[in-house]
C-alpha cells in the first residue's frame, strides 16, 4: 500500500486505518459522529494527500482544457478555482475535478485518488493540441483544514491575509515557515475552511504547526469516514457512488458546470446537447427518510406499488439531523420535491421523501 507523509502520524494517533485507492488511509480516530460534529462546530484536519495533481502548461493549455473539461475555463481568472468534470465519449463522466488557474498558461488539476491513473491516461490520449502535461501526484501533499474556526487557526501561521481569499480562490505563499504553499479557500465539507498543497517533505512541519496553533480551538484529526458524511449532508457528489462512467453530468445535476459555449468542443458535447434538448430519463435526487432506517449504496428505490424506479447511490445517518439521508438516481417522474418514494431494505419498504440538498442548512 502507498503511504502519505502523515501515515505514521495517523497510526501513532491510533486511527483506524484502511486501504483506499491503494493508500493506507485513516477512516476514523475518535469516531465518525464526533469527528463530523467537530468539523461542523470547530475545526478538523483531513489528510487528503492521496488526491492526484496534474500540471497543464504552455500556450496550448487553455485549448486543451476547453476540449477535455465540461466547464468554461476561458472565464477562469488567475487565482481562482473551478469545479468541472471530464466527460467521456458516451456522455458519462471520467472524473470530477478542480481546475486552478495558477498563473498565465499554467493550470493545476486536482483529481480523485481512485482515478489518478485513469485520468492521466485520459488526458495524455486526448492531448491533441500539444499542451505540456505533468503528473505531480507523488510530489504534492495536501491537508484540508475545515470548520468555522479554520481561518482563525491558520491565520496564526501565515502572513497571507486569509480573509482576503474568497471562496474558490487561492494564493501561493509562506505557511508555517514553509515556502510555496498553495492556500485554497475550498473544501468538501460545507463547513468552510482551506485546503493546503505543499511538498511532501514539508508535511510534518506543517502538521505539527497546525495542531499546536489549533489546540485552543479544540482541533482534531479527521478520517475519511466523516469526510463522507460531511459531503453527503451537503449533497456533494462522490465519484464511484453518485458519478460514474455511465452517469451524465446533466443527470447528476451538474448542468451548471456543463457549458455549451461557442468554441468549446469538449468530448460528447453534441451527445449531451441532444440529451438536454430531448429531456432526461433519470435524475439524481436527494431524499430523507420518513420511516426509521439508513439507506445504503445499492439499495433499490421503488414506488408505492413496489416497482423499481431507481437506486441509492449514497446514504447515511445524518449526524446533524439524526435521520437517514441519501442520494440516488430515479426516473424523472419521481424527481419533484415532496415526492414520496420507498427504499427496499431487505424486502421492507421504508418511506422517504424527495428534498432539496443540502440536508445541513
From Swiss-Prot:
Coiled-coil positions are none
Report one GO cellular component.
cytosol
Q: Which reaction does it catalyse?
A: N(6)-[(R)-S(8)-aminomethyldihydrolipoyl]-L-lysyl-[protein] + (6S)-5,6,7,8-tetrahydrofolate = N(6)-[(R)-dihydrolipoyl]-L-lysyl-[protein] + (6R)-5,10-methylene-5,6,7,8-tetrahydrofolate + NH4(+)
GO MF: aminomethyltransferase activity; transaminase activity
Q: Under which EC number(s) is this enzyme classified?
A: 2.1.2.10
- Set out the biological process GO terms recorded for this chain's protein: glycine decarboxylation via glycine cleavage system
Note the subunit structure.
The glycine cleavage system is composed of four proteins: P, T, L and H.
Q: Which NCBIfam families match?
A: gcvT, PRK00389.1
What does the protein in this record do?
The glycine cleavage system catalyzes the degradation of glycine.
Name the record gives this protein: Aminomethyltransferase
Q: What is the lineage of its organism?
A: Bacteria, Pseudomonadati, Bacteroidota, Bacteroidia, Bacteroidales
The gene that this protein is the product of is gcvT
Amino acid at each position: 500500500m502507498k503511504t502519505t507523509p502523515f501515515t505514521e502520524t495517523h497510526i501513532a494517533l491510533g486511527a483506524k486505518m484502511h486501504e483506499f485507492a491503494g493508500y493506507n488511509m485513516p477512516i476514523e480516530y475518535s469516531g465518525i459522529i464526533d469527528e463530523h460534529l467537530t468539523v461542523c462546530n470547530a475545526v478538523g484536519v483531513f489528510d487528503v494527500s492521496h488526491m492526484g495533481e496534474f500540471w497543464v502548461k504552455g500556450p496550448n493549455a487553455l485549448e486543451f482544457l476547453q476540449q477535455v473539461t465540461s466547464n468554461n475555463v476561458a472565464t477562469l481568472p488567475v487565482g481562482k478555482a473551478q469545479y468541472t468534470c471530464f466527460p467521456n465519449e458516451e456522455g458519462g463522466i471520467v472524473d470530477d475535478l478542480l481546475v486552478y488557474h495558477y498563473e498565465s498558461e499554467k493550470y493545476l488539476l486536482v483529481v480523485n485518488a481512485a482515478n489518478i491513473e485513469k485520468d492521466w491516461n485520459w488526458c495524455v490520449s486526448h492531448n491533441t493540441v500539444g499542451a505540456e502535461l505533468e503528473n505531480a501526484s507523488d510530489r504534492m501533499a495536501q491537508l484540508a483544514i475545515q470548520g468555522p474556526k479554520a481561518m482563525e487557526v491558520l491565520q496564526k501561521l501565515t502572513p497571507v491575509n486569509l480573509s482576503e481569499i474568497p471562496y474558490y480562490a487561492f494564493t501561493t505563499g509562506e505557511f508555517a515557515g514553509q515556502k510555496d504553499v498553495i492556500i485554497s479557500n475550498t473544501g468538501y465539507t460545507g463547513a468552510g475552511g482551506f485546503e493546503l498543497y505543499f511538498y511532501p517533505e514539508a508535511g510534518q512541519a506543517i502538521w505539527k504547526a497546525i495542531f499546536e496553533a489549533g489546540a485552543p480551538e479544540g482541533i482534531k484529526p479527521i478520517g475519511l469516514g466523516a469526510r463522507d458524511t460531511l459531503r453527503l449532508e451537503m449533497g456533494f457528489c462522490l465519484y464511484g457512488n453518485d458519478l460514474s462512467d455511465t452517469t451524465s453530468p446533466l443527470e447528476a445535476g451538474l448542468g451548471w458546470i456543463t457549458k455549451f459555449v461557442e468554441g468549446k468542443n469538449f468530448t460528447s458535447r453534441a451527445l449531451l446537447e441532444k440529451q438536454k434538448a430531448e429531456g432526461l430519463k433519470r435524475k439524481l435526487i436527494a431524499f430523507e427518510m420518513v420511516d426509521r432506517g439508513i439507506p445504503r449504496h445499492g439499495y433499490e428505490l421503488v414506488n408505492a406499488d413496489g416497482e423499481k424506479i431507481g437506486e441509492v447511490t449514497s446514504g447515511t445517518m445524518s449526524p446533524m439531523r439524526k435521520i437517514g439521508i441519501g442520494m440516488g438516481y430515479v426516473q424523472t417522474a419521481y424527481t419533484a420535491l415532496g415526492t414520496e418514494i420507498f427504499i427496499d431494505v431487505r424486502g421492507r419498504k421504508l418511506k422517504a421523501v424527495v428534498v432539496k440538498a443540502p440536508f445541513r442548512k
